């Protein structure tokens, strides 16, 4: 039972630490593990019920509270939570499809990604972590996507933007570091519609990247501030490095 109670203590710590407004990755780790912690709570509850003679009811109630705590948050990001969607009006533009992919810089399966583009045929596609190898390989796609903007980097923060629509205006932002870009791409369609695509890829808080979430949080806050200034229909897309379950 020592192991059982040790796991419970770990569950409690990982659940409570993110409630503190500390940007160190240790405090933010629990945010990324919410799904795991929810299932861990279920397993611990099940084990406790099976061994009810050894596990006090108060422990089971505590585990149930943590299960509800995590499940309530995750539920908002599932299909069970129906979000209100505005009906398409008569003067709406035609549908636009966008495909965004973090291709993982060290992945060399170029053809598999290109087949994905051929299959889905999006109007716009974006690659994140794309370096010079990916830029060269994806040139075969430029016949169908003549409008491009390329930020080729070898630090896993490269970005490449490909579009069937003309790029009316494009800005590169470096909100938190001079080697971590974000893109602000303005479109003006023939029907007269204006919209903006904002591509972001801030660094995550982790032992191997950033010791805290300051750069990630700063990047996302800077993007939010910029969105208020733009005051146009905007799509924010990319790898936000917040939590996988959202």
Identify what each model region corresponds to.
Residues 2-49, 63-70:
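Membrane-embedded alpha-helical segments of integral membrane proteins
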Residues 21, 35, 76, 167, ...:
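Residue-level marker of positions within ordered structural domains that often coincide
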Residues 50, 67-119:
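N-terminal signal-anchor transmembrane helix
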Residues 53-62:
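Membrane-interfacial entry segments at the cytosolic side of transmembrane helices
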Residues 98-99, 104-118, 124-246:
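Soluble catalytic domains of enzymes that build or remodel membrane lipids, polysaccharides, and related
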């Amino acid at each position: 039972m020592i192991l059982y109670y040790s796991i419970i203590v770990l569950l409690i710590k990982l659940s409570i630490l993110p409630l503190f407004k500390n940007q160190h990755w240790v405090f933010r780790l629990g945010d990324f593990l919410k799904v795991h912690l929810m299932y861990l709570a279920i397993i611990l509850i099940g084990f406790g019920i099976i061994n009810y003679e050894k596990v006090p009811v108060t422990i089971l109630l505590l585990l149930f509270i943590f299960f509800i705590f995590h499940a309530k948050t995750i539920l908002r990001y599932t299909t069970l939570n129906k979000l209100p969607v505005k009906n398409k009006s008569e003067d709406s533009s035609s549908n636009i499809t966008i495909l965004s992919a973090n291709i993982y810089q060290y992945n060399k399966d170029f053809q598999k990604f290109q087949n994905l583009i051929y299959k889905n045929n999006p109007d716009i596609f974006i690659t994140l972590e794309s370096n010079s190898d990916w830029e060269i390989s994806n040139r075969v796609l430029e016949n169908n996507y003549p409008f491009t903007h390329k930020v080729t980097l070898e630090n896993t923060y490269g970005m490449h933007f490909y579009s069937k629509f003309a790029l009316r205006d494009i800005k590169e932002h470096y909100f938190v570091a001079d080697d971590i870009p974000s893109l602000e791409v303005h479109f003006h369609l023939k029907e007269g519609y204006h919209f903006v695509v904002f591509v972001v890829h801030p660094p995550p808080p982790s032992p191997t990247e950033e010791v805290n979430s300051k750069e990630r949080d700063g990047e996302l806050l800077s993007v939010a501030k910029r969105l208020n200034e733009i005051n146009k229909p905007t799509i924010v897309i990319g790898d936000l490095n917040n939590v996988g379950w959202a």
